[in-house]
Amino acid sequence: LAAVSVDCSEYPKPACTLEYRPLCGSDNKTYGNKCNFCNAVVESNGTLTLSHFGKC
């Protein structure tokens, strides 16, 4: 089973697009896109991880 991950090295960003490509975080919350998810990862000091692509 391959671990799913997202490269968040270019984040945080001050603004995210409204593009809808959902990701499910380890907090069981659905993030609208990679930018929203990566900003949350940065804010969590790396404790938030990707559970899977798509809605939770």
Swiss-Prot record:
S-S bonds: 8-38, 16-35, 24-56
Q: What is its main location?
A: secreted
Keywords per UniProt: Disulfide bond, Glycoprotein, Protease inhibitor, Repeat, Secreted, Serine protease inhibitor
**From what superkingdom does this record's organism come?**
Eukaryota
Glycosylation site positions: 45
Q: Where is the Kazal-like domain?
A: 6-56
SMART domains associated with the record: KAZAL
Which compartments is it annotated to reside in?
Secreted
Record site feature (Reactive bond 3), residues = 18-19
- Among the Pfam families in the record, one is Kazal_1
GO MF annotations, alphabetized: serine-type endopeptidase inhibitor activity
Cited SUPFAM superfamilies: Kazal-type serine protease inhibitors
Gene Ontology CC annotations of this record: extracellular region
Give the comment on domains.
Avian ovomucoid consists of three homologous, tandem Kazal family inhibitory domains.
Name assigned to this protein: Ovomucoid
Q: Which organism is it from?
A: Meleagris ocellata (Ocellated turkey)
